[in-house]
């Protein structure tokens, strides 16, 4: 079948790029022809001259990249951001089959729909109302073709009553629904009376060997721990991590921190390599937890320090399913090895269940097309 993935297109987010790749590879392994729709819901929130020029050049074009390279000569921060974006765009170009067109909220003609047999919505936080990009496009309401959601996430534990009808309309248009978190299951069940399947994030459907195939091969001279925080890291938490590193004779590498300029430039392929080579991981990120598990690393999860609704449900669901709830920093026994023989058995069971949902849903769609 010809399948279109509808997800968030974030060319600066590791988890987003890697889940997109993983879902594509999984669908292709089932014999499908897969493309990801470039779904640009809102224009860049840049202002002034830079925004106007980028609008004229077009989204994600090489001209836009050259424009950003020009601005990068004026500051080290812009230079680092430019290098980082190049790495993300190169990864996308080499590994993700994207449409040569884009759609947004103003699009009125969807001619490509004629060539699509089925849409798969997800994964990632495609249904998070707090994101400025969120719209009807995230339910593919523009098409009457069959729709499946795979590991779609709301990103939050509940939604405002004022949005209930908006979600009901969107969810009722999806033929087969699966979500990534238990909280998402409760939201869907409450809104439309359907109990969706809770499935694994696509990144966990691929094996360690699968990921190593697209990883960089850089070798590091010193043993290191990887620190990857999306929220602010407290003084106490970082002090704890420093003590852990010192007691084990490890150096610290910090991702997503401009204090480590080398790692700030890292793209998704470098991200994979760093997790494969790290001795331990300290994080508040869902996908950092996922890749720690994939590569069987010692890890500790910290509460994310940021303003806004809690996003812990996705981590809670994953850790609960794999009997790893003691990996929260506040609960874990420090330096105690993780029994990955047990964890991987549970992961394989969840993987079989998740793949079964996807295969069965696709088979039903294919039968309906051939009837």
Enumerate the predicted regions with their spans.
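Active-site anion-handling motifs in enzyme catalytic cores
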Residues: 1-371
């Amino acid at each position: 079948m010809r399948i279109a993935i509808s997800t968030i297109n974030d060319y600066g987010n590791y988890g987003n790029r890697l889940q997109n790749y993983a879902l594509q590879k999984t669908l292709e392994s089932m014999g499908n022809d897969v493309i990801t729709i470039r779904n640009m819901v809102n224009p860049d929130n840049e202002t002034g001259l830079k925004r106007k020029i980028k609008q004229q050049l077009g989204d994600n074009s090489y001209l836009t990249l050259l424009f950003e390279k020009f601005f990068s000569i004026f500051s080290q921060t812009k230079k680092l951001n430019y290098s980082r974006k190049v790495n993300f765009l190169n990864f996308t170009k080499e590994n993700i089959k994207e449409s040569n067109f884009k759609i947004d909220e103003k699009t009125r003609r969807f001619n490509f729909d004629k060539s699509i047999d089925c849409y798969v919505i997800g994964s990632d936080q495609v249904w998070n109302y707090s994101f400025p990009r969120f719209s009807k496009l995230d339910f593919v309401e523009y098409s009457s073709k069959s729709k499946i959601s795979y590991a779609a996430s709301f990103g939050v534990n509940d939604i405002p009553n004022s949005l209930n009808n908006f979600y009901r309309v969107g969810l009722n248009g999806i033929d087969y629904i699966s979500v990534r978190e238990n909280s998402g299951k409760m939201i869907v069940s409450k809104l439309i009376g359907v109990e969706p399947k809770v499935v694994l994030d696509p990144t966990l459907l691929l094996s360690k060997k699968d990921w190593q195939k697209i990883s960089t091969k850089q070798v590091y001279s010193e043993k290191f721990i990887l620190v990857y925080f999306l929220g602010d890291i407290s003084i106490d938490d970082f002090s704890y991590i420093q003590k852990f590193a010192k007691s084990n004779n490890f150096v610290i590498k910090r991702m997503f921190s401009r204090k480590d300029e080398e790692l700030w430039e890292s793209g998704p392929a470098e991200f994979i390599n760093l997790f494969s080579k790290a001795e331990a991981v300290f994080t508040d990120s869902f996908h950092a937890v996922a890749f720690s598990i994939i590569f069987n690393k010692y890890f500790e999860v910290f509460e994310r320090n940021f303003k806004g609704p809690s996003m812990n449900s996705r981590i809670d669901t994953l850790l609960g399913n794999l009997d790893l709830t003691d990996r929260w920093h506040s609960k874990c026994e420090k330096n105690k090895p993780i029994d990955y023989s047990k964890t991987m058995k549970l992961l394989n069971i969840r993987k079989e269940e998740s793949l079964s949902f996807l295969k069965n849903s696709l088979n039903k769609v294919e039968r309906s097309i051939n009837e």
